[in-house]
Amino acid sequence: MTIALGKFTKDENDLFDIMDDWLRRDRFVFVGWSGLLLFPCAYFAIGGWFTGTTFVTSWYTHGLASSYLEGCNFLTAAVSTPANSLAHSLLLLWGPEAQGDFTRWCQLGGLWTFVALHGAFGLIGFMLRQFELARSVQLRPYNAIAFSGPIAVFVSVFLIYPLGQSGWFFAPSFGVAAIFRFILFFQGFHNWTLNPFHMMGVAGVLGAALLCAIHGATVENTLFEDGDGANTFRAFNPTQAEETYSMVTANRFWSQIFGVAFSNKRWLHFFMLFVPVTGLWMSALGVVGLALNLRAYDFVSQEIRAAEDPEFETFYTKNILLNEGIRAWMAAQDQPHENLIFPEEVLPRGNAL
C-alpha cells in the first residue's frame, strides 16, 4: 500500500474563497454568510409590516380597519392574519388565491404569511450571525444559544400554534392591540394563565428582570476605583485588564442579606443566562401543547361543588366563568362565518355593556 504525502493546493481564485473573503471582511457592519439570510429576510419582514400597517385593510379577513390610512394609530394598526377559509395556505403572490394580483393578495392577508415567514428566517439568521461571529473571534456560542429562546417563542406562537388549529387565522396579527386580543383569546379558550408552562415562563422572565436589577445595582455598589473622566463612559477603557468592582465585597454583602451568595462570576452569569432562556423555552413548549389543544390544570371538584352549592366559590371558579364569557363574546365576533348564536341569557353583562 502506497501513501502519498503532499500539500493540497487550492486555486487562489476559487469562487468560495472570494465570497468568503468578501463576506467576512472586517468592516463597520459585519455581513458574513449568515447575512445572506438575515439581511434580505429582515428587510422584507420589516418592510412588509410597515406596508401593511400603513395601507392594507383587514376588512376582507376580519371585518376590521387596521391601517393608518383608515384612521388607526400605532397601537391599533396591524398586519392581520388571513381568513379562516384560507386554512394553512402559504398565500404566495403567484398562487391560486391571488393569481399574481398584488391588491387581491393584500386583501386576502398575504402580507401576514409574508411577514411571519420572513420574520422567522430573519430571527434564525440573526442567531446564525452570533454563531458565526463567535466562531470568528473564538468565543463560546452562548449568545446564540440564549437567542434561541425568543426564536422558540416566535415560532411556537406565530407558526406552530396556528398549524395545530384550523388555519393561520388563529395566529396573532402583527400589531400591539391585535396581540393583546390574542392574549385574551388564549386565556378564554385555553385558560393560559393556569398553564404550568406559562407559569414557568413568567417566573423566568420576571426572575431574569430581578436578577438583572440586583446584578447591576450590586456592581454599582461595589465600585472601588474612580477614573479621571467626567463619567463612567469616559473614565474607563473597555479593554482594560483590571476590574473596578469587588466580587468579594458583593459576596459578603449578599451572604449577610440572604445567608447565601454566588461564589464566583461564572456561576452567577450562567444563572442569569439559564433563568430567562429556560423560561422562554418552557413558554414555547406550552404553546406547542395548546396547538394540540392540551388542557391546563382543571380543578373539576371545585367546579362541581360550585355548581351544586351557590355559596361556594373560589378564584378558580370565578375565572372559569370569566373564560366562558370571553368565549361567548369572542367566538361570535371573530368567527362570523361559523354563524355562532348565543342566547341573550348566557351572554355576560356588566356596567360597560
Swiss-Prot record:
GO terms for molecular function: chlorophyll binding; electron transporter, transferring electrons within the cyclic electron transport pathway of photosynthesis activity; iron ion binding; oxygen evolving activity. Its EC number is 1.10.3.9. Pheophytin a binds at Q130, N143. Chlorophyll a ChlzD2 binds at H118. Chlorophyll a PD2 binds at H198. The chain crosses the membrane at residues 41-61, 125-141, 153-166, 208-228, 279-295. GO terms for biological process: photosynthetic electron transport in photosystem II. It is found in: Plastid, Chloroplast thylakoid membrane. The modification N-acetylthreonine is found at T2. A plastoquinone binds at H215, F262. 2 of the reaction center chlorophylls (ChlD1 and ChlD2) are entirely coordinated by water. Photosystem II (PSII) is a light-driven water:plastoquinone oxidoreductase that uses light energy to abstract electrons from H(2)O, generating O(2) and a proton gradient subsequently used for ATP formation. It consists of a core antenna complex that captures photons, and an electron transfer chain that converts photonic excitation into a charge separation. The D1/D2 (PsbA/PsbD) reaction center heterodimer binds P680, the primary electron donor of PSII as well as several subsequent electron acceptors. D2 is needed for assembly of a stable PSII complex. Belongs to the reaction center PufL/M/PsbA/D family. This is Photosystem II D2 protein. The lineage of its organism: Eukaryota, Viridiplantae, Streptophyta, Embryophyta, Tracheophyta.
